[in-house]
Amino acid sequence: MRKLTKMSAMLLASGLILTGCGGNKGLEEKKENKQLTYTTVKDIGDMNPHVYGGSMSAESMIYEPLVRNTKDGIKPLLAKKWDVSEDGKTYTFHLRDDVKFHDGTTFDADAVKKNIDAVQQNKKLHSWLKISTLIDNVKVKDKYTVELNLKEAYQPALAELAMPRPYVFVSPKDFKNGTTKDGVKKFDGTGPFKLGEHKKDESADFNKNDQYWGEKSKLNKVQAKVMPAGETAFLSMKKGETNFAFTDDRGTDSLDKDSLKQLKDTGDYQVKRSQPMNTKMLVVNSGKKDNAVSDKTVRQAIGHMVNRDKIAKEILDGQEKPATQLFAKNVTDINFDMPTRKYDLKKAESLLDEAGWKKGKDSDVRQKDGKNLEMAMYYDKGSSSQKEQAEYLQAEFKKMGIKLNINGETSDKIAERRTSGDYDLMFNQTWGLLYDPQSTIAAFKAKNGYESATSGIENKDKIYNSIDDAFKIQNGKERSDAYKNILKQIDDEGIFIPISHGSMTVVAPKDLEKVSFTQSQYELPFNEMQYK
């Protein structure tokens, strides 16, 4: 085990860590009340699911889509069945007739049309989802039948409609001026929990929906409690003030690996990990014209500086496997190998020399035309593992004569930089099993995705067109081949450097049963969990 933090070491010395002292009462009270209280580094935010200001794990307790994406494919949810026209452009959904919104309003075809129309009024915001650009119109056929018409066939349509947002449903009574793009009055969905008291930057309550149309939650309440990651979150779990923690929708864990082990060792908690959900990666911004990262040869050199085996083993403690390609082979349509560059400092050095960046006699930093080889890297300051990786890469880059300045920022600020292009390198992650490969690939050319990162590619328009064409292919083998061709070109550009295949980690009371995962790293089925 790596060196303990000072606070944890003090607790261990005082005998509090392993005895479980002080934690049982809080845990027992929560069990008696059938309540989970999870620790989170940020407030749940704006719970309007038609924009992107809220916590996805929180929103998924309240709102539901027409269909759900499972390991066995697309399954019914609010729609009990559907038909697809021969040309692949018309989807007819037959809705459940026993669903009510939290405010008592009937869920029907009219509500579906109003919600999808509301999302489409803000479709530029959703451009990373291809379906948002293809929806032509929505027609109500009868009270519980709705028709969705696309401008062209789009094979991933159902998968994108199954996502936790934005195509989920808010009570039309909550709309402002007949739409949701400027906010909603309340947050009434159809899901197994209702939003209760919300104290901004403190806590939020999600109460059991006793009128839920499906299997009702065994828990009476799920509470989100805001606190800093690290020691504060650890002590809160130890005392039983909170009793649940999980990887959030930005890939951030409130607890580091040492804290996870210590909590498990108390005997009060269990730790569960999902299958690989996404790929953690380093994004190198080809569009940053005032920096060396705009040079393809330099980007390729950086790809050879990342020792993913060492990162996975030593920094991630073996909990995540090294990622040798952008998408793992458990992702839909990725049934091929696409190995990326291997760790090779000699090769990296050769490529930097080739790009004209030379080591001088009086400086450890490479120079070209009198300019130092310097880059800025950004990581999520809420993630202890990203910080460790950034520090490790800083040392590796120094060996190669690169001055790497590392900067920790909030996850929201990182997302802003991704959109604006104001970065040289940053840590990020693929969209995940529920979304991929289509969503991450679509994001290669989306303004609020990775357009800035790919904007420096010489033949970018050709690649962008290939992406659009791939999404129209109905045949699975042909679509897979198209994705392979796109990913081969992208990998050659050295923009997305895979590091590890990330999974979702959950810390839960030892006597909590049915702790499971979905296909999404952005949500958890809290309604299925129950105490022994």
Swiss-Prot record:
Matching Pfam families: SBP_bac_5
One of the protein's GO biological processes: iron ion transport
Presence of keyword Transmembrane: no
Residues linked to a lipid group, S-diacylglycerol cysteine type: C21
Subcellular localization, as worded in the UniProt entry: Cell membrane
Task of the protein: Part of the ABC transporter complex CntABCDF (Opp1) involved in the uptake of metal in complex with the metallophore staphylopine (StP). May be involved in the import of a large array of divalent metals ions such as nickel, cobalt, zinc, copper and iron. Binds the metal via the metallophore StP, and transfers the StP-metal complex to the membrane-bound permease.
Record-given protein name: Metal-staphylopine-binding protein CntA
Species of the source: Staphylococcus aureus (strain Mu50 / ATCC 700699)
